Regions:
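An aromatic- and glycine-enriched ligand-binding surface/loop that stacks and positions planar moieties
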Residues: 13-175
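Conserved aromatic-histidine-acidic binding/catalytic patches
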Residues: 11, 37, 44, 206-213
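Flexible helix-coil transition and linker loops at the boundaries of alpha-helical arrays
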Residues: 2-12
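A structural signal for long alpha-helical coiled-coils and helix-turn connectors
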Residues: 3-4, 27, 53, 228-229
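C-terminal substrate/ligand-recognition segments
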Residues: 145-230
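Hydrophobic alpha-helical segments with strong N-terminal bias
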Residues: 9, 120, 203-206
Length: 230
């Protein structure tokens, strides 16, 4: 009761909906974490999920709306870390720089966004990508893969080392391998599926304005379903 009610005005705050969601998550994993208490843990999961479901949250008809540039309007969001495209990182606000962390420095030519010089960083583990069925809409909606085409020319994008920018699912590297002096141009720097779940704004430069939903209603439905089965 000490948490504020789950209202639009309290978006981004730790509301009652967030509190019940966290309790459900804790009870669901209590056994794995070695936590003991009186009562049936799975019934407590169900009870807390039911409380969240009664608060007026709604599943978005299009799941991608939860990751759009304007996802602060999602009726599914329960607890969100909020971001703004105007965040500088120098004003006490953490910037959302997912695009810098995952995109190749020439992906912007294919995506039609302003941001260039991204850091060519993280990519998904191949085993994880292959968990998705090829016909699952979430596959293409989550990962950026394949040959990148320049929107302005219609031709394949070439990296600075004269290789076609083709994001393969497999990654040509050995985890933990120490640098052996190989020339950077010989490294398959375009390998790996990049994160494509959050929408990239066309005018994106240094900071993304998409919020990060820590809890959303879909998670509540899945937790209740697991508790009922277990």
């Amino acid at each position: 009761d000490i948490c504020p009610p789950a209202t639009t005005e309290n978006y981004g705050s730790f509301t009652q909906g967030a509190a019940y969601s966290l309790l459900a998550k804790l009870y669901l994993n209590a056994e794995a974490w070695g936590v003991t208490f009186s009562g049936n843990a799975y019934q407590k999961v169900i009870d807390n999920c039911d409380k969240v479901m009664a608060m007026g949250y709604i599943l978005e008809p299009n799941w991608k709306d939860n990751f759009s540039v304007t996802n602060e309007n999602s009726k599914e969001a329960i607890l969100a870390a909020t971001f703004s495209s105007s965040d500088t990182g120098n004003d006490g606000n953490v910037k959302n720089e997912l695009h810098n962390n995952t995109l190749h420095y020439k992906d912007y030519l294919s995506l039609g966004i302003t941001a260039s010089g991204t850091w060519n960083g993280i990519c998904a583990q191949p085993e994880y990508v292959r968990l998705f069925d090829e016909e699952d809409a979430r596959l293409d909606g989550t990962f950026l893969t394949g040959l990148m085409i320049d929107k302005s020319t219609g031709k394949p994008i070439m990296t600075d080392h004269n290789n076609e920018l083709n994001h393969t699912i497999d990654v040509n590297m050995i985890p933990g391998m120490e640098y052996d002096g190989t020339n950077w141009s010989a490294v398959e720097q375009h390998d790996g599926a990049r994160c494509f779940k959050w929408e990239f704004a066309s005018d994106l430069t240094s900071s993304m304005g998409n919020d990060f939903h820590i809890f959303r209603l879909a998670d509540i439905y899945l937790m209740k379903a697991e508790a009922l089965l277990r």
